[in-house]
Amino acid sequence: MRILLSNDDGVHAPGIQTLAKTLREFADVQVVAPDRNRSGASNSLTLESSLRTFTFENGDIAVQMGTPTDCVYLGVNALMRPRPDIVVSGINAGPNLGDDVIYSGTVAAAMEGRHLGFPALAVSLDGHKHYDTAAAVTCSILRALCKEPLRTGRILNINVPDLPLDQIKGIRVTRCGSRHPADQVIPQQDPRGNTLYWIGPPGGKCDAGPDTDFAAVDEGYVSITPLHVDLTAHSAQDVVSDWLNSVGVGTQW
C-alpha cells in the first residue's frame, strides 16, 4: 500500500511523526506536510504565490508556507511517484468533531485527496498524549481497507479518545454533532500600543446526541463519520425554488 500522509499541525508535529513511523512498518509512506502549523486553514489553496519544498534526509517533504490542501495537491500531482493508493491526514493534536470539520485543515487534506479521486482518512486525537493509540487504530482500519476496499466515495473522519489502547471500548459510526456559535475575541496590545486580536476557543457542544461524534468520543469509543465533498442541501432545493416563485424573484428585476 502506498500512502500519502499529510496534516495541518506541521511536518514535525508528534502526531504525523508517530503515525508515519507506525505506517512504515507495513506500507510505503510519503510525508508531504506544511513546514509550520496551519491549523484552521480549511480547504485554502495557494494561488497567488509559488510554493517551495524542502526534503529531509528521511524523505519527508515540507511545503514552505503551504496549506494542507496545497500539500495533498502537490503530493498527488507532483511529489509522490507512483501515485498513492490512499491519502491519510493526521494525527491531529485535538479533535475534529461536529462543526470543527468546516475549519479543519486535517479534514481538508483528506477532502482534497478524495476530490482528486483517492480514498482518504482524516485522523484526530481528542488530546495530546496517546498518539500511539490513534496510530494503532489507523493502522487497523488501513489493513482492513487493504483486505476489503470501502467504495463509498466518502472520506472517513476518525476521532480517537485520548486513552491507552486497552481502554478504547470500540468503534461507532456517527454523524457530526454541532457546537454553539463561537463568540470570543481576545484583544491585546503590542509594544507600540496597537490592538491585536486572537480568535477565541470554539463554542460549546450544542447537539451531542447519542449518535454523534461528540458522544462516541466522550464515552470512550472511536468515532468514524463518513463525510462527502458535495455541500448541496438537497432537501432544501424545493423549498428554495418554491420561495423564489412565491416572492417573484427571477420573473422581474
Curated annotation (Swiss-Prot):
Role summary: Nucleotidase with a broad substrate specificity as it can dephosphorylate various ribo- and deoxyribonucleoside 5'-monophosphates and ribonucleoside 3'-monophosphates with highest affinity to 3'-AMP. Also hydrolyzes polyphosphate (exopolyphosphatase activity) with the preference for short-chain-length substrates (P20-25). Might be involved in the regulation of dNTP and NTP pools, and in the turnover of 3'-mononucleotides produced by numerous intracellular RNases (T1, T2, and F) during the degradation of various RNAs.
Q: What is the lineage of its organism?
A: Bacteria, Pseudomonadati, Pseudomonadota, Gammaproteobacteria, Enterobacterales
In its keyword annotation, does this UniProt entry include Cytoplasm?
yes
The primary site where this protein sits is cytoplasm
Q: What is this protein called?
A: 5'/3'-nucleotidase SurE
| Cofactor field | a divalent metal cation
Q: What does the record give as the reaction this protein catalyses?
A: a ribonucleoside 5'-phosphate + H2O = a ribonucleoside + phosphate; a ribonucleoside 3'-phosphate + H2O = a ribonucleoside + phosphate; [phosphate](n) + H2O = [phosphate](n-1) + phosphate + H(+)
Q: Which NCBIfam families match?
A: PRK00346.1-1 (NF001488), PRK00346.1-3 (NF001489), PRK00346.1-4 (NF001490), surE (TIGR00087)
Q: Could you name the Gene Ontology cellular component terms for this entry?
A: cytoplasm
